[in-house]
């Protein structure tokens, strides 16, 4: 697919002219209000809006451009959005008045400007887990495993021996797991976001080529106590666990941000307005994908 650059330039935000690297608007000197001897122009209003909401508005415009390329509006989306509107009207008093107070003419505009884009955002995230599978595997190292949390290494070694003898993990867990164990031999998805398991265990599960018992006892500290763990790899084949990976990670803030960055890179996102550039540089440098040096850690 040909990459179409997404540029935040003069066309965005209804800009009609550029002065150097800073966007301006047509008729910027036209007075829109006065108070005493002070007058405010269209240019004053635009500059204020750009400074106060410019970055948010920029990214919303960019998202819409990405949705247009990646997630078409379907009949099913329209149906879901209409059902949401109907539900709001049934359960909220003065729904139409409320959305009008937010600046929407009617429920149809609210549906098109808010609800449908929200559905598109969800679909884009789901698509990301297919499009960026290599990135996800590299970053989050997902695998599905059956893990048993034991009180100490000695107990874990006994559990490991039972697993190697072919005993079902849940049966082994009943005998050897610590009281109130989080990991009791049931299938669970493990990723780098799983903070109560050791990095070594996560990496081992991710790299192991064949499903089965991992012949090692792992330890990790949790709430001031060190526990021992044994594990059985179920699968680390991405296509087999993708749905679980999506369910587990899709609402994570880092993943949501990474999703947007992925598509910004795909469409060569650039910012040509200095004010917006500076704002993004200060708050979300990772979105300035044409300048990866800005998002690099100082460490």
Give residue spans per PLM region.
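Peptidyl-prolyl cis-trans isomerase
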Residues: 162-203
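Short, aromatic-enriched amphipathic alpha-helices that serve as compact interaction elements
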Residues: 155-163
């Amino acid at each position: 697919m040909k990459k179409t650059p997404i540029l935040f330039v003069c066309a965005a935000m209804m800009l009609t002219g550029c002065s150097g690297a800073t966007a301006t608007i047509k008729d910027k000197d036209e007075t829109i209000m006065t108070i005493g001897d002070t007058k405010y122009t269209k240019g004053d209003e635009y500059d204020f809006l750009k400074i106060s909401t410019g970055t948010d508005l920029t990214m919303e415009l960019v998202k819409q451009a990405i949705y247009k390329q990646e997630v078409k509006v379907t009949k099913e989306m329209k149906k879901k959005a209409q059902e949401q509107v109907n539900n709001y009207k049934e359960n909220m008093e003065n729904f139409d008045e409320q959305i009008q107070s937010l600046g929407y003419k009617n429920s149809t505009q609210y549906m098109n400007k808010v609800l449908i884009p929200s559905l598109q955002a969800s679909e884009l995230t789901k698509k990301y887990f297919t499009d960026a599978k290599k990135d996800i595997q590299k970053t989050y190292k997902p695998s599905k495993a059956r893990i048993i949390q034991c009180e100490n290494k000695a107990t874990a070694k006994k559990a490991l021996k039972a697993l190697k003898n072919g005993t079902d993990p849940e049966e082994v867990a009943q005998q050897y797991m610590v009281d109130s164990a989080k990991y009791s031999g049931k299938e669970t998805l493990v990723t780098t976001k799983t903070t109560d398991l050791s990095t070594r265990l996560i990496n081992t599960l991710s790299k192991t080529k064949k499903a089965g018992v991992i012949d090692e006892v792992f330890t990790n500290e949790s709430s001031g106590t060190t526990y021992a763990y044994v594990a059985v790899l179920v699968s680390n084949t991405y296509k087999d666990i993708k749905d679980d990976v999506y369910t587990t990670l899709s609402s994570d803030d880092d993943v949501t941000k990474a999703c947007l960055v992925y598509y910004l890179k795909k469409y060569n996102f650039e910012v040509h307005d200095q004010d917006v550039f500076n704002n993004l540089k200060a708050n979300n440098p990772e979105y300035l994908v044409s300048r990866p040096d800005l998002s690099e850690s100082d460490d």
